[in-house]
Curated annotation (Swiss-Prot):
GO biological process: Mo-molybdopterin cofactor biosynthetic process
Organism: Synechocystis sp. (strain ATCC 27184 / PCC 6803 / Kazusa)
Stated name of the protein: Putative sulfur carrier protein slr0821
InterPro entries per the UniProt record, alphabetical: Beta-grasp_dom_sf (IPR012675), Mopterin_synth/thiamin_S_b (IPR016155), Sulfur_Carrier/Prot_Modifier (IPR052045), ThiS/MoaD-like (IPR003749)
Any single Gene Ontology cellular-component annotation: molybdopterin adenylyltransferase complex
Top-level division of the source organism's lineage: Bacteria
Lineage: Bacteria, Bacillati, Cyanobacteriota, Cyanophyceae, Synechococcales
Length: 109
């Protein structure tokens, strides 16, 4: 019996660009991560990271992103302490060993 052929990748280096990063999860979102404050995810950029989080922690994306898929207004993402709003947004590239912090904004007077 012949096994079915595997699909060919149009870009064989695609998987080489995916990096393992550490994600710091704020307490209000830890119900999606079974109480874990940090998790490791594989992604090439912040947008892919959000998708990876959703795949592993169903329901978390609705808390992270608005209906258009953009990060929620009062939620900040930092890559190695750099705010992604001042980098490339969700297209911000990730490297192996990066630390991504998800930080709810604090308001008040």
């Amino acid at each position: 019996m012949v096994s079915p052929a595997l699909p060919r990748l149009s870009n064989p280096l695609f998987f080489a660009n995916i990096m393992t990063v550490k994600v710091l999860i704020p307490t209000p979102l830890q119900k999606f991560t079974s109480g874990q404050a940090t998790i490791d995810c594989e992604a090439a950029n912040v947008g892919q990271l959000i998708e990876a989080l959703e795949a592993n922690c169903p329901g978390i994306k609705a808390r992270l992103c608005d209906e258009e898929g953009k990060p929620r207004r009062f939620l900040n993402f930092y890559v190695n302490e750099e705010d992604i709003r001042f980098l490339e947004g969700t297209d911000t590239a990730l490297s192996a060993g990066d630390e991504v912090s998800i930080v709810p904004a604090v308001a008040g007077g």
